[in-house]
Amino acid sequence: MAGTHVTFTVDDRAVLDMLARQALPPGSDVMNRLGEYLQSSTEARFKTQTAPDGSAWQPLQPRYAKRKKYAKDKILTLRGYLRSGIHYQVTGDAEVQVGSNTKYAAIHQFGGAIEKPARQAIVRYRSEAGRVLFAGKKHQGATERQVTIPAHQVNMPARPYLGISAADDAEIRAIILDWVSSLRK
């Protein structure tokens, strides 16, 4: 799974020994249940806009918030691609990975600096009531000018969405206990 992910591993010798004695493939059902729960829990963080530790995500920069077209009040959500890109994968008898394969998933999870190289661009502007305004491609009467945008750095704050909260930990234990209880019947 490309992008970023969190791995959950069952490392309890008693549970693993019990799995080894079962006729069922080890952990197949419980690992899928854990993966489904963790995927759902991770997706829910986009509604609460909080990290697994319960802290609020850092707010949007005012300039970006002002020009954001969709979901203006939502952090890490423009069209929902990051949230809908959360998936889980059972990778072993006792392991589930939860993550996203979107190319920008890691920068949002961990934060960091994005280096933007210098580039050429065409700027379109128009004048209205003595003010200079940017104009779209189709705007008639706009003046075009080629400009050089210098190299610069964009600093992205970490807004962790992957991880296990205290509530997740309790639910994981409940799912495993429920599953172990069902094996004993």
Describe each model-derived feature in a short phrase.
Residues 1-185:
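Short, Lys/Arg-rich flexible segments
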